[in-house]
Design a protein with these regions (language model features):
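Residue-level "edge-of-site" marker
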Residues: 4, 34, 60
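A short acidic, often aromatic-flanked loop/helix-cap motif at beta-alpha or helix-coil junctions
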Residues: 35-40, 62
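Gly/Thr-rich phosphate-binding loop signature of adenosyl cofactor/nucleotide-binding cores
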Residues: 49, 53-106
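Beta-strand-loop-alpha "switch" segments that mediate conformational coupling across diverse proteins
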Residues: 26-36
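Conserved GTPase G-domain signal focused on the G5
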Residues: 10, 39-42
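Feature captures the catalytic cores and cofactor-binding loops of soluble hydro-lyases/lyases
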Residues: 1-23, 28, 78-80, 92-138
């Protein structure tokens, strides 16, 4: 018997509990720990789900997994501490200061690396904002 998505800190206890309930005591029991990356959607999958398109960035990064989602409908001062490793950050398209702060945080090396950014809303990005990240590396 195999128990999947098990709490990594409780593997032995889970195996023992399941072993006690098995009908045939000779059947081995294993527990496989939860792995967030196995259930995380890819950036490409999220892009398809929201009918989005790549505006900037390396298309090779679209295969990365999004481990969490940060909804950034707040000022950059409040968004930055909420960034987590490999998160997708959803930013209102008219909050360009939050977009720029997120891009800078991602490039800085002092904040968690984000997996992607989704801009939400009908507002086009101003051309200077589109040009600014051209000097950043992916």
């Amino acid at each position: 018997m195999i128990v999947n998505r098990a709490d990594p800190e409780q593997l032995d206890g889970i195996e023992e509990a399941v072993a006690a309930l098995r009908p045939q005591k000779t059947t081995p029991v294993w527990a496989i720990p939860e792995d967030r990356t196995l259930v995380a959607p890819s950036i490409d999958g999220i892009l398809a789900a929201v009918d989005g398109r790549l505006i900037k960035g390396d298309p090779d990064r679209l295969g990365r997994e999004a481990l969490t989602i940060v909804v950034a409908g707040m000022s950059m001062v409040n968004v930055l501490p909420r960034l987590t490793e490999e998160s997708v950050v959803v930013i209102p398209a008219d909050r360009t200061e939050v977009l720029l702060a997120t891009l800078l945080a991602d490039a800085s090396g002092t904040f968690p690396r984000v997996a992607g950014i989704i801009l939400n809303g009908p507002f086009p990005l101003p051309e200077p904002i589109v040009q600014l990240p051209d000097g950043f590396t992916s």
